[in-house]
Curated annotation (Swiss-Prot):
Its EC number is 1.14.14.1. Heme binds at residue 432. The lineage of its organism: Eukaryota, Metazoa, Chordata, Craniata, Vertebrata. GO terms for biological process: organic acid metabolic process; xenobiotic metabolic process. Cytochromes P450 are a group of heme-thiolate monooxygenases. In liver microsomes, this enzyme is involved in an NADPH-dependent electron transport pathway. It oxidizes a variety of structurally unrelated compounds, including steroids, fatty acids, and xenobiotics. InterPro entries: Cyt_P450, Cyt_P450_CS, Cyt_P450_E_grp-I, Cyt_P450_sf, Cytochrome_P450_fam2. Expressed constitutively in liver, lung, testes, and kidney. This is Cytochrome P450 2C16. GO terms for molecular function: heme binding; iron ion binding; oxidoreductase activity, acting on paired donors, with incorporation or reduction of molecular oxygen, reduced flavin or flavoprotein as one donor, and incorporation of one atom of oxygen.
Amino acid sequence: MDPVVVLVLGLCCLLLLSHWKQNSGRGKLPPGPTPFPIIGNILQIDAKDISKSLTKFSERYGPVFTVYLGMKPAVVLHGYQAVKEALVDLGEEFAGRGSFPMLDKVSKGLGIVFTNGKRWKEIRRFSLMTLRNFGMGKRSIEDRVQEEARCLVEELRKTNASPCDPTFILGCAPCNVICSIIFHNRFDYKDEEFLKLLEKFNENVRILSSPWLQVCNNFPALIDYLPGSHKTLLKNSDYVKNFIMEKVKEHQKFLDVNNPRDFIDCFLIKMEQENHLEFTLESLVTTVFDLFGAGTETTSTTLRYSLLLLLKHPEVADKVQEEIERVIGRHRSPCMQDRSRMPYTDAVIHEIQRFIDLVPNNLPHTVTRDIKFRNYFIPKGTDIMTSLTSVLHDEKAFPNPKVFDPGHFLDESGNFKKSDYFMPFSAGKRICVGEALARMELFLFLTSILQNFKLQSLVEPKDLDITAVLNGFVSVPPSFQLCFIPV
């Protein structure tokens, strides 16, 4: 048969299959924009700012609607009430991890982020317990973060108040905290192996937030056959996993079951004590990879965005420094006990996280069983997208949400004001494992920097662009330089 005829027949069959699948599912799922065959709603979604497109859809279809990413449907939850109802009130039913083909290819169903069912519960429980035993949210981890904050300050002094791009320096600090927990040692900020590791993570975040990755995720059949930045992401991930495996092998040589030094030792001991299918060397490497990915680049990007916003709003930086001077002074390091006496600084850090909206659409969830949600039937295994933008930028909770204003988290008396709408770490069963650590790092690193330096922009604040250059998976700030002027 003529190859052209075969191709045409194949395309026709694919179109018919796509049309049938979309029509058979749409009658049961929540309403949404009409999808095109094969490509779904891709052309109706801005790959550079997905959350903006979802907001437009919600204005027409309400807080619960369906979009087709390729041939696969995803139910979108938009607004605080819908997100809370699903992730918190029905936490067990919405606790599944949805499909993210590029990262699924990296994790291979292992680790803590992209696993499901019993394996996920076992690894998450073990990781939380181990991190807690090593002092996560307690004194010993605070000591490590304080030590790293002092190293960060010394590294910033070496810039001699000259213009610098803070990307890698700010990446070193949170990465070293994770290293101390997982490997029992930190790296020098000039260590070539360490800097290469950071470079791989930084590049992967940019790739993950690019429009091309949205295409790869929506059409996973293309991943193995087309060239593109997704290949770099896979190579970078392999490099990091090989680095971790070498560290694991070193730990195996000197393992003392009666004296575990770090996370890797604890995992290896667990492997020896229990013959769990969940606890294997491959699972250990992927779990450590997940902890690095979640605990390094997210905090580093938030710190970078923090400095950019403080340069844009020098009056806010001045007020924070006044509070630091009043509460902490110059002769001791900041500690977590200070936070309760520093409502303005606490409000600024919360507002930074709210404003930058780091992970606009959260990681995908999936329902673990057939469920009726707000009178709609959602079959088991359906992907769920939760718009964190719609919560963090809710106009009722945060008047003028597009404006950076620490007053969003202050009451009339200047006291810190909590908000149920503050969920940059997600919510429910899948809330970020490292939330306590991230909050500690943001407070101690930022207060340490502002205790020792005045931030000086190279351009007028009004000329600084604070718009995210990528807004797909993660909101990535534009590149910028500044001077750290010792005070």
